[in-house]
Amino acid sequence: MGGLQKKKYESGSATNYITRNKARKKLSLSLADFRRLCILKGIYPHEPKHKKKVNKGSTAARTYYLLKDIRFLLHEPIVGKFREYKIFVRKLRKAYGKAEWSAVERLKENKPGYKLDHIIKERYPTFIDALRDVDDALSMCFLFSTFARTGKCHVQTIQLCRRLSVEWMNYIISSRSLRKVFLSIKGIYYQAEVLGQTITWIVPYQFAHNHPTDVDYRVMATFTELYTTLLGFVNFRLYQTLNLVYPPKLDGQGEISLKAEFEEDYALESESYTEKLSALSASLARMVASVEEEEAELDHFPTEGEDQEKMEVREKMEQQQSKQKKLFEGLKFFLNREVPRESLAFVIRCFGGEVSWDKSLCIGSTYEATDETITHHIVDRPSMDKQYINRYYIQPQWVYDSVNAKIQLPVEEYFLGVTLPPHLSPFVEETEGDYVPPEKLKLMALQRGEKPQAEEDEEEEGEEEEDDEEDEEDDEQSEDEEEAEEEANLAEMEEKRSQGKSLSVKVTPGKAKAENRARAAEEEKAEEKRLAIMMMKKKEKYLYDKIMFGKKRKVREANKLAAKRKAHDDASKADKKKKKKKC
C-alpha cells in the first residue's frame, strides 16, 4: 500500500536554496541594493552539493543563497530605507526636470537615511567579537584615508576614515599596545595586542597612486560604510577603558607645546586641531587626571591545572613586554624631511620616545633640530653637511628592527651610507628543522645578551685563508721530503720481511672498558621505537610515514637553503679578495 508519490524538486535540497534573481525579486530590490544588503548583513552565497537537483535538472551556472537567509532579510528595517531612497531619487529627478528648485531643496532636506548600529550589535554580540573582526576594518579605513579627493568615493567617507584611523593610532600610543612592525612591498604591517586580542593591519605607503579601473569601488564603499560604524564603536569603548576623553582631545600641556606661531599657514582653522591630533606628537586628555603611583608587586599563584614552570614562563613574558613598552623611553628623535614621518612618529611614540621634525614639514613639531638633548637623528640620505657630535645619525630601519628585536640594536650597522642588514619579518617563527638565516641567529644572540663575533670571525677566516695561500708554497717542499722518508722506511720493512726477520710482537694486558650508560639507554630507546613502528597498524604506519616524509623534506629544504647561503657568502668573499688585490 503505497502513499502518494512525491513530486520532483518539491522537497530536500531543492527547497533549501534560492537563486539570486528570485531572492532579489522577493525583496523588491535592485541588484546593487541587494548586494549592499548582503554585505551589510553578512549574507553570502552557498554552493549546493547537488546543483542539478537544486536547479530542477538544469546545469546552468547560477548563484544560490540559503532560503532561510533571504527570509531573515525580509524583516530587515534597512530594506524599507532602500525603497524610500529609490522613491526619493525618482522625485528628485522629476523636480530637477521641471526646474522646481524649491521642491529640490525641500527633498534634499528630507533625504532618507539609515543607521547600522543595530546591525553591528547583531553581528557582534560581545565587544571581544568586534575586536577579533577589526583587522579588516582597520586595513580598509587606512586605505580609504590615503585616497585623493576624486570622484571615485565621497569626500565625507575619506575624512571619516582619516579621523577614525587617527583615533586608533592615538589609542595604541596611549596604551602602548604595539608589538611588531614589518615593512613590505604592499605596505607597513602593524601588530598590536589589545585586551588580549592580537590585531594585525596594513597601512599603505604615503605615495600618490592611480586608481585601478578593474576595482568595483561601490562594493568597497559598502564595506567601508560597515567598517567605519564598527570602528567608531570600538574606538569609543577602548577610549573608555583608558579613561580618555572621546572624541580625543589634547591635554593642556600638549596643546601648549603644539601651539604654532602661524597655524593658518599649515591648515584652515577648522582643520588645525585635527591636524595636531594626527601629528601623534602629544598626549591625550583624560576624564580624570591620572595619579602616578608606585606599582605594587602582587604575589602570583598558579591557577588550577597550571604548573610552576608555565607560571614562570608567563611571568618572564610579562617582564619582557613591560620592558619592550619602555624601549625608547628617555630618547629624543628628530626626523628629517625625507623619512616616512607618520609611521616613525607612531612607532616611536608607542614605545615611550619623544619625536619632532622641521616646522616647515608639518604641524605638531615640539622642538627644533638644534636642540642639544636630541639623541637620534633619523636620516635617509647618503650624507649630511652639518652634523652634531652629541647624537647618532641613523637610517629609519633601526627603529623598526629594534622594535621587532625588543632591544635597542647597535647603531653601527645603521649609520649614514652603510649597507643595511636585511629587514627580517617578525611574523616568521622558526620551528625545529627550519632554516634559520645567520642574521636571525645573530639577533637571537643579541637578545640573549651575548656579543656575536660572527663578522669578526669571518674577517679572521678571510685573513687566515690569505695567510694559508701564502704559506702553501712554503709547506709543499717539506711535505715532499716527509713523503720520501716514509717511502724509504716502508721499503726497509718489506726487505726485512722478505729475509725472514720477523718483527717483535708485544702482548699488552687487556683493560675492562667502562660501559657508556647514556649510549646504552639511547640504543634501548631506538630499539623500542623500531619495535613500536613494527607493531603499528597499516593506517597508523601510513600516517607515520607521511609525517616522517614531511620532516625529511623540511630538512632537505633547509639544507638546500643553507648550501645556497654558503655559496653566496663564498662568492662575496671571493669578490672582496679580488677587489683587495686590484687595490
Swiss-Prot record:
One of its GO terms (cellular component) is preribosome, large subunit precursor. Residues 275-329 form a coiled coil. Residues 512-526 have a biased composition (Basic and acidic residues). PROSITE patterns: BRCT (PS50172). Residues 448-526, 558-583 are annotated as: Disordered. Gene3D superfamilies: BRCT domain. Keywords: Coiled coil, Nucleus, Ribosome biogenesis, rRNA processing. Residues 323-416 form the BRCT domain. It is found in: Nucleus, Nucleolus; Nucleus, Nucleoplasm. It comes from the Eukaryota. Disruption phenotype: Embryos exhibit smaller eyes, a reduced brain and visceral skeleton, shortened fins and a lack of expansion of liver and gut, and die on day 6 of development. Residues 455-489 have a biased composition (Acidic residues). One of its GO terms (molecular function) is RNA binding. Transmembrane segments: none annotated. Its main location: nucleus. SMART domains: BRCT (SM00292). GO terms for biological process: exocrine pancreas development; maturation of 5.8S rRNA from tricistronic rRNA transcript (SSU-rRNA, 5.8S rRNA, LSU-rRNA); maturation of LSU-rRNA from tricistronic rRNA transcript (SSU-rRNA, 5.8S rRNA, LSU-rRNA); oligodendrocyte differentiation; regulation of cell cycle. CDD domains: BRCT_pescadillo_like. Pfam families: BRCT_2, Pescadillo_N. Belongs to the pescadillo family. Component of the PeBoW complex, which is required for maturation of 28S and 5.8S ribosomal RNAs and formation of the 60S ribosome. Component of the PeBoW complex, composed of bop1, pes1 and wdr12. The complex is held together by bop1, which interacts with pes1 via its N-terminal domain and with wdr12 via a high-affinity interaction between the seven-bladed beta-propeller domains of the 2 proteins. The PeBoW complex associates with the 66S pre-ribosome. PANTHER family: PESCADILLO - RELATED (PTHR12221), PESCADILLO HOMOLOG (PTHR12221:SF6). This is Pescadillo.
